[in-house]
Amino acid sequence: MHEPGPPRTTSVGEPVELAPRSPDPDGTYGWTVRDAPADSDLSPGDRPDPDATGPPSSATAVGSETPTAVLRAGETSRDDDPVVHLDPDAPGTYVLALDAPDGTHRQRVRVFPDERREADIRVPVDDLAGNETDPDRVSLLWPHNENRLALDRAERDGDEWVASVRVPPGRHGFGFVPDGDRSAAVHGECEVPGPGRPRVSLDATVVEADDPEESDRLRLTAAVDSAPAVDDVERGGDPDALDAAFLVDDRDADPEAVAAIESQAEGRTLSVPLDDLPDSVRIHAVPHGERYGAAETVRVEADETETDGSEAAASVALVDPNPTPEWAESPTIYEVFVRSFAGDTLPTTFREVERRVEYLDHLGVDALWLTPVLASPTDHGYHVTDYYDTAADLGSREAFESLVDACHDAGIRVVFDLVINHTSRDHPAFQLHSAGVDAYADHYRRSDATADVTGIDWAELDGGAAPDHYFEWGRIPNLNYDSPAVRERLLDVVDEWAAVVDGFRADVAWGVPHGFWKEVADRVPADTLLLDETLPHDPFYGEGEFDVHYDTSLYETLRSIGAGEEPAEAVETALARGEWLGFDDHGAQMRYVENHDEDRYLAEYGRAALRAAAAVTFTLPGAPMIYAGQERGNETYRGPIRWHDGDNKLTDFHRRLAALREAEPLLRDGDVRFDGRASGVRVVEGDADRVTAYERTPPAAGATDGGDADRDPLLVVVNFAAEPATVAVPDGAEADLFGDGNAVERDGEEGRRVAVDAVAVLR
């Protein structure tokens, strides 16, 4: 089936890519508008504009954009339009038809009002002056233009460089880059006041009919929560403005049935007779108010159960169509930079990693994430030259599969680093593309010369003077997802390795279209973990796509705490910011203090702060991640692991954190509270700004994975200071389960006290 996937949601000014699934490169495809909002320039019968191809350029700059086509053709040399880009110009519902080799498919896009607001980013001229000369040009670099240098330019205004932008509310990190030199960039934050995104959860009940002649009804209720207030910039949402939109999946019912079901929604409730439902139907609930949020989806299936007689009682079962694998709900992840893991003498091979699996088991690791293992001319492996062959210096595919088997024997899952946003420019496909071979003409995106800062005299081709790339990454050109041939080949790559490994970490996930990730999520085996590298983390990558996300909010906060720029209590703010962004599930975050792209926390902030930061990652919900060497005292971010001269006490500290997390279900899936007992923690001796406390309590809905929702809450106290802190804790805190602090002592009328070195976990 070439159906284009679920209904899509976006807002005015935020383009969405639409594409057939399981594409046939030799098939013929075409898109036609069936319906559009009254205020849109699109009309029924319209087709993609042949003079506007590919995703639209950055829409962040104010006053510089020219009128854009609402429906753009794909960036290919084909006569048909397999992939199109909708750049909505009005709120409402757009309905499109995809004519494909297997028939006609319906695609709806629900568009909410424009969320962008105007702001000026200003940087003093003196901050960007190098060698006593002013730059000729200054580029704005940030996620809102997909980190493309030279796409948005700042203008000189007196003694400042100014970029006028239009972006959603929030704090947006940016760089002003002089003359394409990112090493000389000035970084800062653009503050755009406004509300966060709402969050939604669904509750379902079957309401029995009073009249036996009538059908029982399915009642879906959307609980919509407004965003919390983080500060004066990232303010809370208006609860009175909240609502939910219910969208029935067009793949599961004909348009008439879809309209009949959706018409029975009233506010946040959808009540439908069971007789009106197909045997299996997916329903998406989208929260919206001042802004819109990520949808939650349920699949409603007929469930014929036998009663005490022989009659079948009509009922339904509700199924999560993209559940997180049970093993991946809260695993301890260990990232290995593959070419440095064996130490400073032996070359790292799959065999050498396999010989050290016992160490991973000893440490308490649940999942091993390996940086790329495929053929590549680089040490880091992110410039892939062959998607089907392992790197020769690491070993054969058989040796890799032997490593996977050894991990499985130890109860450890293996996560594969999937690099499909780009290839190496040494990949044969790019070389053939550059040489003008027709079959590869559409395999890579192209840009005009003004967007290229590499200084390379690229081979001239139709479609653009230079290959498209992010930052100054001229060695890794971006693949073109408008090409059905590219999509087909990369889906084949996913299939190839999904049969071998247990999960994928998606490199530069933010560069690959959402529609493709939705297809991958539906395609891989049900027990496959999907982890996205999206910076900053974005809740829409959890909308039928990824199970776990980089927690960039906590990562940045732990760095700021380590540097003394924020107090330890900013951990609470980091979690609130995740909710403000629109994340509903704390457990869907990978918590980390460093990785292969970042400086070592130990080298930057010291051993005491590292131990505290690591303790935070292990005592919050989510998936704690150790970057190999973090636990051994490594100070170089990609250097060899310190085996013979490593810090064994630091290693044991991490091992005990993993063991305690495994032993205490509340540390894995309990709720987090900063009020209650946590608010009663008081620093008696030590630096109060370096201490934070929070409580892990039984989940509000359902039991813990240990099967006991009545377990006593756990009080976590973390100290980032180099010296121990003595804290007064509320009565009832009897024992330090971690054992890093001294025994809890009674202190007369003052309650109880505990000395906290790095962390205490009290019951």
Question: Where do the protein language model's features map onto the residues?
Answer:
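Substrate-binding/active-site clefts of carbohydrate-active enzymes
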Residues: 339-342, 373-395, 400, 405-495, ...
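An acidic-aromatic substrate-binding cleft motif
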Residues: 307-359, 363-366
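Aromatic-rich carbohydrate-binding modules that target alpha-glucans
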Residues: 114-169, 179-194, 249-264
